[in-house]
């Protein structure tokens, strides 16, 4: 029986290579990172990782791409993604670690930890007794996928009221997902923004979500609300956010993603004390966290097993929808 050609783009150690070979070696022939050749790309029926557009177009036998991250912007922007090629992502690997990032940074803002970090550098013992708590707050989560559900689940430990916003219409049986108290579609966004103490963006990047949190919507939020974005930078127009913050609106902002990355050195956001900035690391992939890395490989192996057995793959991306 002719073996299926599988190209693995990410760097993987000998242990992972052995796992693939032991589990699938009878049916697959693997080409690992660092050993790619023009012939291997052309022959590949399956690619695990993030191939470049020119590689996809060269892969004459390509049937399936398994991404090792969640975002698919790179492929939705392709002029002509090949018909007959299935794209799947690694949804399910990042929800836990991103939820910890979100909650940790909200607590940092509420307890004014950045000010204490600055005082530490100056050896200053200054007590600020004003502090906030997540307990009992109204939480609005934009996006009810793996990341949104994980954030909602952990927010419930603080006895919060958690509302979810889905991009698409909400079927009746989903209007109360177990992690959320309420779930609505985008038509309810304006009303829900006004109620929320904390707004968390984890929506995919699509034409419909681009610029969704514009100046008017940001300013409609409570003056002392906290805004977090761990989804896509296109959700929030940077200039609109800067304007709102300069006008003294919002208690603070946690930003891991931006319209332009890297964030330009000249951006006023860098100098705002109530803005916490990280360089798109809320959900670290390979080399960032061993548990996340294991979950990514488990997703890849489970889907490869499904592919070989003719079963439906998990995490199929709908390119026309952008996620």
Residue ranges of model-derived segments:
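Rossmann-like dinucleotide-binding domain for NAD(H)/NADP(H)
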Residues: 224, 230-323
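Rossmann-like adenosine-cofactor binding region
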Residues: 169-268
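Glycine-rich NAD(P)-binding loop of Rossmann-like domains
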Residues: 116-150, 178
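Oxidoreductase and adenylate-handling cofactor-binding alpha/beta cores
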Residues: 99-115, 157-160, 297-306
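Conserved beta-strand positions in the Rossmann-like core of class I SAM-dependent methyltransferases
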Residues: 163
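N-terminal glycine-/charge-rich "phosphate-binding" loop or analogous flexible N-terminal tail
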Residues: 1-46
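Glycine-rich, N-terminal phosphate-binding loop of Rossmann-like dinucleotide-binding domains
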Residues: 51, 69, 203, 230-231, ...
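Phosphate/diphosphate ligand-binding glycine-rich loop within oxidoreductases
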Residues: 42-120, 131-132
